[in-house]
Amino acid sequence: MVHKSPPSRRACRKYGGVFDVAAYEARIATLEAAAAAPDFWSERARAEALLAELKTLRATLEPWRALRRESADLRALYELAREAQDASLEPELSSLFSDISARFEEASLTRLLHEEVDRLDAFVTIHSGAGGVEACDWAQMLMRMYTRWAERRSFCVHIVDLLESEGGVKSVTLKICGSHAFGFLKGETGVHRLVRISPFDSAARRHTSFTSTYVFPVLDDHVEVHIRSEDMRVDTYRSGGAGGQHVNKTDSAVRITHLPTGIVVTCQNERSQISNRATALSLLRARLYAYERQKKQQEHQRFASEKKDISWGNQIRSYVFHPYTMVKDHRSKCETGNIHAVMDGALEPFIRSYLEFLCTSTQCVEPQ
């Protein structure tokens, strides 16, 4: 017989210790009452924001409700089978247990996300740093890693801006669309260090390369970021490309400079200048939001200038291919020897360990 049992109430307390079901239910009831009011749509922006919050709260709470019901049912079935010594139910019990356990892990990961913007899509910007051609190849490897992670979760990935270079990618901005994409990926911001035998070195020597990643939320309309038109300089230019029939023969690429902060964003991968401008503005809003958050937290790193030294001493994670294989996060201390799985998008252990690390160092706030 199967000796495993579904996630226990003790396990639920372990992973959901800061998850107050009653607080969620109370907030949902308050929002539902507000939505039923006759004058609810008198302020459209506020109404849409409340509905978005209601949708997020329901999506967060429902998996826990379902898990509680299904876990209780499975536990009852397990006890009956054990008392009757009925081994024929073992395959079904094992399958149900695996399914519930997987969804429990996903729900316990999501409950670590409490910031307003955690539910949003994400911009992921990657810049190659110290290491020359090797660093450009490393940036391309990280681009693939995040793309594979998104594909594993059935998220959509769109290239907003791409600057190719010899050996790989000089810089790239991805837009990753999916539930809580920003919340899951926000811990990827920082410098990533690669150690390997370089395929570009004929002497087969070991090289160290650095690449920086910056993750920003794709803000929706209810997150206020005010940008004055006089504070922006908009430049258009011809999109780059590999040549052939897809080369853009018009000045459709857009570069926007925010004059007060010096933040520069570009977009060249949409089909028209209008679309490129809209995407660039969305990216600028995200960058300014992150910039203001950094100022409020009184941190020294500035997302605007992106001048943090992409080299020794600043890395958040190391990826070692030689003389041994290991990926180690220097903040949460999470590590694994299966580096190839990580490079193929298996980031969940690092995402979870960082969010748990973040939750122990900050106060997680439940709905009010």
Curated annotation (Swiss-Prot):
Subcellular location: Cytoplasm
Classification via Gene3D superfamilies: 3.30.160.20, 3.30.70.1660, Release factor
Post-translational modification, as annotated: Methylated by PrmC. Methylation increases the termination efficiency of RF2.
Keywords, in A-Z order: Cytoplasm, Methylation, Protein biosynthesis
InterPro entries tied to this protein: PCRF (IPR005139), Pep_chain_release_fac_I (IPR000352), Pep_chain_release_fac_I_sf (IPR045853), PrfB (IPR004374)
Chief location: cytoplasm
GO CC aspect terms: cytoplasm
Modified residues (N5-methylglutamine): Q245
Pfam family, one: PCRF
One annotated GO molecular function: translation release factor activity, codon specific
Family recorded in the similarity comment: Belongs to the prokaryotic/mitochondrial release factor family.
Function per UniProt: Peptide chain release factor 2 directs the termination of translation in response to the peptide chain termination codons UGA and UAA.
Name the record gives this protein: Peptide chain release factor 2
Species this protein is from: Treponema pallidum (strain Nichols)
